[in-house]
Amino acid sequence: MLSASAIYGADNEIYVDQSGSGANIDLEQLGICNIIGGINSTAGSLTAFDLDGTTMTLDINMIGATNKFLGDINADNFTGLYNFTGGTNTFTIQVDPTNTYSTDGSDQNIAVTGSSNTFTLNQGTTALAASLNLDWIIQGSNNTVTSNINIDGATNYMDIDGSDNAVTYTGTGVNASAGGYFYLDHTGGQRTFNISQLSTQDNDWLKIISVGGNAASTVCVIQNDQGTSTSC
């Protein structure tokens, strides 16, 4: 079942409440101050953006500035394709935070062209993101990315071109098969990277290539397998 509506005014808003399996949802917004909501929605008191089920595909295109993409996704074998063109946009997504469907087999691709955007993606905070394939392609400056993943064989790849970008990534995992791969390829000026891989019963892998930067740049990497608490 899919319930969707658009509200037109100073802002365009899309309300989506999907349950079931096999859904293929394609949403596009052009302009400024639009919302696909969701968590902490404002403007016309928008709620929902809630996807529940399995084997779903969500394709989002937001073209413009100061737009918001907010919500909860509870799905196994989920494909998310997110394209943002413009600046000062907000992306806040939780994937199965209560372990309703688990978060296995997800494939998520986030493409960003623009500056001063804020992205938060939390996947499997109490579930396991088994076989997750997560790709970030970011072109622009002053973007902020925060991601927390309960990994189980997850791959997190980031390709960032631009200056003054900040990345905070935490990968946790507690079962014997947990283990994640994180790869960051960066070209640009000043940057702040804080990477934590915290699998307790398996190996983690990490590769960072960064070209550019200055004395104010910070790169902090922590790999901790039930060891003594560490910090940068």
Language-model features: locations:
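Long, low-complexity, polar and repeat-rich extracellular regions
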Residues: M1-C232
